[in-house]
């Protein structure tokens, strides 16, 4: 593969091992409202990279009782539950090693379906925030993954044409998003052994 013009990394499940923490936060919020069994682990991983509000919209389509709640408030509750768990986050060394290898040689960014402040906190706690020139969070875009907008915005902010970008990603929605943006994708699940929730 020729040297890319830029590298864009997903955050959760790619750079940092946060997926089990997100799963726990989802269940803390859902269990508190009596929805213990509506979000099994396989469905959770299928939504990797999708903003929390979009996940709740999907869950509400399939569980009528959830529609009685303010989904924006539930989104906030989930994010607060996750934020309380962030101090225990660790990095995924195989992928962080790749970021360190390219640091200072190629512009790099993080493109996440999570809130930017939470993404920054995860990167700060793991000591890798300074590797990245740009961080895109869910609040920066109108359409999250699998729409191409998040990765296109990352490329734009780095000043690199999308077709010259390579994306490191672990989730199906991220793969779809990156391919739709015209970018090459590295499936990091082949490199790492993720902790199951």
What are these regions (language model features)?
Residues 21, 50-51, 77, 90-94, ...:
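Short beta->alpha linker loops
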Residues 83-110, 116:
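Short, acidic loop-to-helix structural element flanking the phosphoryl-transfer center
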Residues 35-37, 65-66, 128, 159-160:
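Helix N-cap/coil-helix junction residues
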Residues 28-57, 61-62:
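N-terminal polybasic phosphate/anion-binding patch
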Residues 48-84:
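A metal-dependent, Asp-based hydrolase signature
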Residues 1-42, 180-181, 195:
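Active-site neighborhood of HAD-like aspartate-dependent phosphohydrolases
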Residues 1-5, 96-97, 115-197:
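Asp-based, Mg2+/Mn2+-dependent phosphohydrolase catalytic module
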